[in-house]
Regions:
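Start-of-domain marker
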Residues: 20-83
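Bacterial Sec-dependent N-terminal signal peptides
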Residues: 1-28
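Extended amphipathic alpha-helical interaction segments
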Residues: 101-201, 208
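TPR/TPR-like (Sel1-like) alpha-helical repeat modules
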Residues: 76-99, 166-181, 208-231
Length: 242
Protein backbone atom coordinates (compact mmCIF):
# COMPACT_ATOMS: atom_id res chain seq x y z
CA UNK A 1 0.00 0.00 0.00
CA UNK A 2 2.84 2.36 0.89
CA UNK A 3 4.47 1.68 -2.48
CA UNK A 4 1.22 2.51 -4.30
CA UNK A 5 0.89 5.78 -2.39
CA UNK A 6 4.53 6.62 -3.08
CA UNK A 7 4.13 6.00 -6.82
CA UNK A 8 0.90 8.05 -6.88
CA UNK A 9 2.66 10.87 -5.04
CA UNK A 10 5.57 10.81 -7.49
CA UNK A 11 3.25 10.99 -10.50
CA UNK A 12 1.23 13.82 -8.91
CA UNK A 13 4.44 15.75 -8.25
CA UNK A 14 5.62 15.18 -11.82
CA UNK A 15 2.29 16.40 -13.21
CA UNK A 16 2.42 19.47 -10.95
CA UNK A 17 5.98 20.28 -12.00
CA UNK A 18 5.09 19.73 -15.67
CA UNK A 19 2.21 22.19 -15.34
CA UNK A 20 4.41 24.93 -13.94
CA UNK A 21 7.18 24.14 -16.42
CA UNK A 22 4.76 25.04 -19.20
CA UNK A 23 3.79 28.27 -17.43
CA UNK A 24 7.48 29.08 -17.11
CA UNK A 25 8.01 28.42 -20.80
CA UNK A 26 5.26 30.91 -21.66
CA UNK A 27 6.80 33.48 -19.33
CA UNK A 28 10.29 32.98 -20.77
CA UNK A 29 9.05 33.24 -24.37
CA UNK A 30 7.20 36.44 -23.48
CA UNK A 31 10.26 37.92 -21.76
CA UNK A 32 12.24 37.15 -24.92
CA UNK A 33 9.58 39.02 -26.94
CA UNK A 34 8.72 35.88 -28.90
CA UNK A 35 5.05 36.77 -28.86
CA UNK A 36 4.00 34.57 -31.78
CA UNK A 37 5.50 31.55 -30.00
CA UNK A 38 3.62 32.51 -26.83
CA UNK A 39 0.39 32.54 -28.83
CA UNK A 40 1.07 29.19 -30.47
CA UNK A 41 2.04 27.44 -27.24
CA UNK A 42 -0.87 28.87 -25.22
CA UNK A 43 -3.32 28.02 -28.01
CA UNK A 44 -1.98 24.46 -28.07
CA UNK A 45 -2.32 24.19 -24.29
CA UNK A 46 -5.96 25.29 -24.40
CA UNK A 47 -6.64 22.34 -26.69
CA UNK A 48 -5.71 20.08 -23.76
CA UNK A 49 -8.60 19.31 -21.37
CA UNK A 50 -6.54 20.16 -18.29
CA UNK A 51 -5.91 23.69 -19.55
CA UNK A 52 -9.09 24.63 -21.43
CA UNK A 53 -10.56 26.42 -18.39
CA UNK A 54 -7.26 27.62 -16.94
CA UNK A 55 -7.30 31.44 -16.51
CA UNK A 56 -3.49 31.63 -16.61
CA UNK A 57 -3.26 30.11 -20.08
CA UNK A 58 -5.90 32.53 -21.36
CA UNK A 59 -3.86 35.33 -19.81
CA UNK A 60 -0.77 34.40 -21.80
CA UNK A 61 -2.73 33.80 -24.99
CA UNK A 62 -4.44 37.16 -24.65
CA UNK A 63 -1.27 39.03 -23.75
CA UNK A 64 0.68 37.39 -26.56
CA UNK A 65 -1.95 38.40 -29.10
CA UNK A 66 -2.09 41.92 -27.66
CA UNK A 67 1.65 42.33 -28.14
CA UNK A 68 1.46 40.87 -31.66
CA UNK A 69 -1.21 43.46 -32.49
CA UNK A 70 1.23 46.20 -31.46
CA UNK A 71 4.24 44.70 -33.24
CA UNK A 72 3.21 45.46 -36.81
CA UNK A 73 2.99 41.77 -37.74
CA UNK A 74 0.93 41.70 -40.96
CA UNK A 75 0.55 37.91 -41.25
CA UNK A 76 -3.07 36.99 -42.16
CA UNK A 77 -3.51 34.83 -39.06
CA UNK A 78 -2.89 37.88 -36.87
CA UNK A 79 -5.16 40.29 -38.75
CA UNK A 80 -7.60 40.39 -35.81
CA UNK A 81 -5.02 39.90 -33.06
CA UNK A 82 -6.26 42.87 -31.00
CA UNK A 83 -9.88 41.75 -30.95
CA UNK A 84 -8.87 38.16 -30.30
CA UNK A 85 -6.74 39.27 -27.37
CA UNK A 86 -9.81 40.89 -25.84
CA UNK A 87 -11.93 37.79 -26.46
CA UNK A 88 -9.41 35.63 -24.62
CA UNK A 89 -9.13 38.15 -21.79
CA UNK A 90 -12.89 37.84 -21.45
CA UNK A 91 -12.50 34.05 -21.21
CA UNK A 92 -9.90 34.56 -18.49
CA UNK A 93 -12.41 36.57 -16.47
CA UNK A 94 -15.21 34.04 -17.04
CA UNK A 95 -13.02 31.13 -15.96
CA UNK A 96 -11.63 32.99 -12.95
CA UNK A 97 -14.58 31.85 -10.83
CA UNK A 98 -13.12 32.85 -7.47
CA UNK A 99 -11.47 36.02 -8.74
CA UNK A 100 -8.03 34.74 -7.73
CA UNK A 101 -6.24 35.26 -11.04
CA UNK A 102 -7.32 38.87 -11.42
CA UNK A 103 -5.89 39.60 -7.96
CA UNK A 104 -2.41 38.91 -9.34
CA UNK A 105 -0.72 42.27 -9.92
CA UNK A 106 0.57 41.49 -13.42
CA UNK A 107 -2.82 40.22 -14.60
CA UNK A 108 -4.70 43.15 -13.08
CA UNK A 109 -2.26 45.60 -14.66
CA UNK A 110 -2.79 43.94 -18.03
CA UNK A 111 -6.58 44.15 -17.63
CA UNK A 112 -6.31 47.87 -16.87
CA UNK A 113 -4.08 48.39 -19.91
CA UNK A 114 -6.53 46.64 -22.24
CA UNK A 115 -9.53 48.45 -20.76
CA UNK A 116 -7.73 51.77 -21.20
CA UNK A 117 -6.87 51.00 -24.81
CA UNK A 118 -10.50 50.16 -25.54
CA UNK A 119 -11.75 53.38 -23.98
CA UNK A 120 -9.31 55.33 -26.15
CA UNK A 121 -10.62 53.52 -29.25
CA UNK A 122 -14.18 54.41 -28.26
CA UNK A 123 -13.39 58.06 -27.53
CA UNK A 124 -11.44 58.46 -30.77
CA UNK A 125 -14.31 57.11 -32.86
CA UNK A 126 -16.88 59.25 -31.05
CA UNK A 127 -14.73 62.38 -31.43
CA UNK A 128 -14.66 61.89 -35.21
CA UNK A 129 -18.42 61.36 -35.36
CA UNK A 130 -18.14 57.65 -36.12
CA UNK A 131 -20.52 56.33 -33.48
CA UNK A 132 -21.27 53.26 -35.60
CA UNK A 133 -17.66 52.10 -35.34
CA UNK A 134 -17.51 53.15 -31.70
CA UNK A 135 -20.51 50.91 -31.03
CA UNK A 136 -18.50 47.85 -32.04
CA UNK A 137 -15.84 48.66 -29.45
CA UNK A 138 -18.51 49.51 -26.87
CA UNK A 139 -19.96 46.01 -27.24
CA UNK A 140 -16.45 44.57 -26.93
CA UNK A 141 -15.84 46.40 -23.64
CA UNK A 142 -18.57 44.30 -22.02
CA UNK A 143 -16.22 41.29 -22.21
CA UNK A 144 -13.54 42.85 -20.01
CA UNK A 145 -15.42 44.55 -17.19
CA UNK A 146 -17.17 43.58 -14.00
CA UNK A 147 -18.94 46.97 -13.96
CA UNK A 148 -20.87 47.24 -17.25
CA UNK A 149 -23.20 50.15 -16.44
CA UNK A 150 -21.27 52.63 -18.61
CA UNK A 151 -21.13 50.13 -21.45
CA UNK A 152 -24.89 49.60 -21.21
CA UNK A 153 -25.61 53.34 -21.35
CA UNK A 154 -23.26 53.86 -24.29
CA UNK A 155 -24.71 50.90 -26.15
CA UNK A 156 -28.17 52.45 -25.82
CA UNK A 157 -26.83 55.85 -26.92
CA UNK A 158 -25.39 54.19 -30.03
CA UNK A 159 -28.86 53.01 -31.01
CA UNK A 160 -30.12 56.60 -31.06
CA UNK A 161 -27.20 57.52 -33.31
CA UNK A 162 -28.21 54.67 -35.64
CA UNK A 163 -31.79 56.05 -35.78
CA UNK A 164 -33.06 53.12 -33.73
CA UNK A 165 -35.07 55.24 -31.32
CA UNK A 166 -37.15 52.42 -29.90
CA UNK A 167 -33.99 50.38 -29.31
CA UNK A 168 -32.33 53.36 -27.65
CA UNK A 169 -35.28 53.97 -25.35
CA UNK A 170 -35.47 50.29 -24.41
CA UNK A 171 -31.72 50.17 -23.83
CA UNK A 172 -31.76 53.21 -21.55
CA UNK A 173 -34.67 51.76 -19.60
CA UNK A 174 -32.70 48.58 -18.89
CA UNK A 175 -29.54 50.56 -18.13
CA UNK A 176 -31.33 52.88 -15.71
CA UNK A 177 -32.73 49.88 -13.86
CA UNK A 178 -29.16 48.69 -13.37
CA UNK A 179 -27.99 52.21 -12.56
CA UNK A 180 -30.39 52.29 -9.60
CA UNK A 181 -28.36 49.43 -8.09
CA UNK A 182 -25.07 51.37 -8.25
CA UNK A 183 -24.44 52.78 -4.79
CA UNK A 184 -20.80 53.73 -5.23
CA UNK A 185 -18.03 53.35 -7.79
CA UNK A 186 -15.09 52.56 -5.52
CA UNK A 187 -14.62 49.18 -7.22
CA UNK A 188 -14.70 50.70 -10.72
CA UNK A 189 -11.43 50.88 -12.62
CA UNK A 190 -10.46 54.21 -14.17
CA UNK A 191 -11.67 52.90 -17.53
CA UNK A 192 -14.98 51.80 -15.97
CA UNK A 193 -15.42 55.31 -14.56
CA UNK A 194 -14.67 56.90 -17.93
CA UNK A 195 -17.17 54.59 -19.63
CA UNK A 196 -19.75 55.44 -16.97
CA UNK A 197 -19.23 59.17 -17.48
CA UNK A 198 -19.44 58.86 -21.26
CA UNK A 199 -22.53 56.68 -20.94
CA UNK A 200 -24.31 59.28 -18.83
CA UNK A 201 -23.40 62.12 -21.20
CA UNK A 202 -24.34 60.31 -24.40
CA UNK A 203 -27.35 58.63 -22.84
CA UNK A 204 -28.64 62.09 -21.94
CA UNK A 205 -27.89 63.21 -25.51
CA UNK A 206 -30.04 60.30 -26.71
CA UNK A 207 -32.97 61.48 -24.62
CA UNK A 208 -32.47 65.04 -25.89
CA UNK A 209 -32.58 63.83 -29.50
CA UNK A 210 -36.18 62.69 -28.95
CA UNK A 211 -37.05 65.82 -26.96
CA UNK A 212 -37.22 64.13 -23.59
CA UNK A 213 -35.14 66.80 -21.90
CA UNK A 214 -36.40 66.11 -18.39
CA UNK A 215 -35.30 62.49 -18.65
CA UNK A 216 -31.93 63.68 -19.92
CA UNK A 217 -31.56 65.98 -16.90
CA UNK A 218 -32.62 63.21 -14.53
CA UNK A 219 -30.07 60.81 -16.01
CA UNK A 220 -27.22 63.28 -15.58
CA UNK A 221 -28.41 64.07 -12.08
CA UNK A 222 -27.97 60.41 -11.16
CA UNK A 223 -24.27 60.65 -11.96
CA UNK A 224 -23.60 64.10 -10.56
CA UNK A 225 -22.42 62.85 -7.16
CA UNK A 226 -19.51 61.07 -8.82
CA UNK A 227 -18.66 63.37 -11.72
CA UNK A 228 -19.56 66.90 -10.66
CA UNK A 229 -15.86 67.82 -10.63
CA UNK A 230 -15.29 66.47 -14.15
CA UNK A 231 -15.10 69.22 -16.79
CA UNK A 232 -16.80 67.27 -19.60
CA UNK A 233 -19.59 66.06 -17.35
CA UNK A 234 -20.11 69.52 -15.87
CA UNK A 235 -20.35 71.02 -19.36
CA UNK A 236 -23.07 68.54 -20.33
CA UNK A 237 -24.83 69.03 -17.00
CA UNK A 238 -24.83 72.84 -17.28
CA UNK A 239 -26.06 72.61 -20.87
CA UNK A 240 -29.07 70.61 -19.72
CA UNK A 241 -29.72 72.97 -16.83
CA UNK A 242 -30.15 75.94 -19.16
Amino acid sequence: MKKILLVASIFATMAFNSLFAQYDELRILFADQKYEKVVKLADKMIGDDKFKKDPMVYYWLSKGLYKVSQSGNTAPEYKNAYKESINHLGKLLRNDKEGEAIQEDEINEYLLEVQGSLVEQIKNEISTGNFRKASSWILTYKKVTKNPIGQMLLEAAGKFKADDKSGGIAGLKVAETELAKVKDIKDFTEADKEMFKLGLIWGAEGYTSIRQVEKAKALLEKGSEWFRQDEDFQEAYNKMAR
